[in-house]
Amino acid sequence: MRKHPFHLVDPSPWPLLASFAAFLSTTGGVMYMHAYSGGGLLLAIGQLSLFYVMYVWWRDVIREGTYQGHHTNPVQVGLRYGMLLFILSEIMFFFAFFWAFFHSSLAPTIEIGAVWPPKGIQVLNPWEIPFLNTIILLTSGASVTWAHHAILAGNRKQGIISLAITVLLAVIFTGFQALEYLEAPFTISDGIYGSTFYLATGFHGFHVIIGTIFIAVCLFRLVLHHFSKSHHLGFEAAAWYWHMVDVVWLFLFVCIYYWGGA
């Protein structure tokens, strides 16, 4: 059993229940946007159900890998490929947003004054909060790498400290991003600039929140002795995801904040 290449799992109700929760969320979202009665309630029920199913599903995955020994070396290879493909799919999302941004900025139409940024848009100074957030996020990338080296060296204390620093920096980044949104002189409704800016940076912020939860769970698991030198796939996946968030932010800073606001 130790070397078999098959990802054997117990029968689980969570995939079916997740699809039902996603259906409720989608239906409720459409009803809410069209002001139908009960749309908001249905959306809330669907979202809460989806979050609960995600929690219990990942709980079962942790049990299978940590306590039941289902995650053999060949299975871990498959899980790594799956995580890499997932990260690639996320990068394709951002590729679409950058495409929309450059399509609009490299050849601005007459409707926005044939200039970029569009006339009437007061852009953000890239050397204030955006640059500070860049430093914070790059520092968090360094601290998560520190945690990886600590786990590989068997230094659990350093791993816990470095992961706690990563979570703290991620929360600070999110707080500054929220402050930037509150003080921004334009909204998502302000034409193509506002829509592309908030879509790209907001989607990245959503990924930061997901990554923060991911790393916080890894911190909790490290405290519970779930990770060892040779078996810490959950942490590796979180670290890869966080580095993807770092790299995407660098492109956002250079392309949208610096070049796009010049």
Swiss-Prot record:
It catalyses: 4 Fe(II)-[cytochrome c] + O2 + 8 H(+)(in) = 4 Fe(III)-[cytochrome c] + 2 H2O + 4 H(+)(out). The chain crosses the membrane at residues 13-33, 38-58, 82-102, 134-154, 159-179, 200-220, 237-257. GO terms for biological process: mitochondrial electron transport, cytochrome c to oxygen. The keyword Chloroplast does not apply. Keywords: Membrane, Mitochondrion, Mitochondrion inner membrane, Translocase, Transmembrane, Transmembrane helix. PROSITE patterns: COX3. It is found in: Mitochondrion inner membrane. InterPro entries: Cyt_c/ubiquinol_Oxase_su3, Cyt_c_oxase_su3_dom, Cyt_c_oxidase-like_su3, Cyt_c_oxidase_su3-like_sf, Cyt_c_oxidase_su3_a-hlx. Pfam families: COX3. It is a multi-pass membrane protein. The keyword Ribosomal protein does not apply. Its main location: mitochondrion. Its EC number is 7.1.1.9. GO terms for molecular function: cytochrome-c oxidase activity. It is an enzyme of class 7 (translocase). One of its GO terms (cellular component) is mitochondrial inner membrane. Component of the cytochrome c oxidase, the last enzyme in the mitochondrial electron transport chain which drives oxidative phosphorylation. The respiratory chain contains 3 multisubunit complexes succinate dehydrogenase (complex II, CII), ubiquinol-cytochrome c oxidoreductase (cytochrome b-c1 complex, complex III, CIII) and cytochrome c oxidase (complex IV, CIV), that cooperate to transfer electrons derived from NADH and succinate to molecular oxygen, creating an electrochemical gradient over the inner membrane that drives transmembrane transport and the ATP synthase. Belongs to the cytochrome c oxidase subunit 3 family. Component of the cytochrome c oxidase (complex IV, CIV), a multisubunit enzyme composed of a catalytic core of 3 subunits and several supernumerary subunits. The complex exists as a monomer or a dimer and forms supercomplexes (SCs) in the inner mitochondrial membrane with ubiquinol-cytochrome c oxidoreductase (cytochrome b-c1 complex, complex III, CIII). This is Cytochrome c oxidase subunit 3. It comes from Prototheca wickerhamii. The gene is COX3.
